Structures are given as structure tokens and as C-alpha cells.
């Protein structure tokens, strides 16, 4: 369906159900695409989103599974981006993200990272901090808000809640300087 719609699938790793090779699953197809289901709220009942990522195929990718030389050397990709959801899906994806960012940096490729912390993906914030800080160390352009910097990396602003905006902004800028230095 992707190819029929004109989407370039050259870099997609296809998983098979023949139980042969590194990207294989059993005949039952226990690997699947991750899906999100959102229940619409009504009245005082808020909406709720459920994520089904437990057996998502991308969770199985790890270091060495993607031809990074082809991407960054042969094809000359100039911008590499990853995000906090992918990096926290599994220990393998975390290691792949670090490998990806390092390889991009070796080739002078601009590297960006969207913190995009989701507690439903990794509820252990200390674990998330450790993984994300390794990736941030390899990043040129970091995307996040105050909550992301706190939840994904463990950085807090020194401003008390309810302070004037200018005071909060100064404290936020100070926190960003610490993140950049670290």
C-alpha cells in the first residue's frame, strides 16, 4: 500500500513470518505496527489515548540493523532526526538512536532530537533521563518544552510557580544554558 501510494520504501526493513533471519517472527505474526486508539470524551469525561506498542516491529531494531553508511555517506543525508518516543520503546531502539546520532555527527550531518517524553512509553523517569542524556550529548538541535526538559532529562527551572513571566523566562534561559553546557 505504501508503494502504491508513491511512498519510497527503500529504507524500510521488512519483517517476515518465515522464522528465518534477524527480522523474522513466528507464523502468528507477533510483530505488528504500533497503533494508537483515542476514546473521545464527553461532558466531564476526558478523552483518553491508548497505545499498543508492545510488539511493534520497530522495537526489534537495534545497533547494526540500519545501514548508516548508506544513509549518511553514500546518500549524503544532511539532517538526522529522532525523538523520545522511538528512543524509549526498547533498550535496542535506545542504542540504535545513539549509534544513529553518532554516525550522523561523524559525517557533519545536522542532528536534531525531540524530547517528546511520554510516561506511557517509559514510566521510569530516571531511566529515561539516562537514555535521553546520552542522545542529547550527540545532538545539535534540541526540541522540548519545560515539561520535557524536566521529565525527559531531569532539568528544572529555578523559578517558583506563579512568578511574573519575565522572571520565569530568565530562569528558563538559565536552565537551557545548563543543558547546553552539560
Where are the predicted features?
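Surface-exposed amphipathic alpha-helices with a cationic face
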Residues: 98-105, 180
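Anion (oxyanion) recognition and catalysis
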Residues: 3, 102-106, 136
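Conserved phosphate/ATP/ADP-binding segment of small-molecule kinases
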Residues: 107, 121-182
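Conserved N-terminal subdomain of the carbohydrate kinase-like
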Residues: 1-84
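Active-site glycine-rich loop that binds ribose-phosphate moieties when present
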Residues: 60-68, 95-99, 126-131, 170-174
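Hydrophobic beta-strand scaffold residues
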Residues: 9, 111-112, 143
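Short, small-residue-enriched loops and turns at beta-alpha junctions
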Residues: 58-59, 88-89, 119-122, 151
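Active-site beta-loop-alpha junctions enriched in small/polar residues
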Residues: 54, 85, 116-120, 147-149
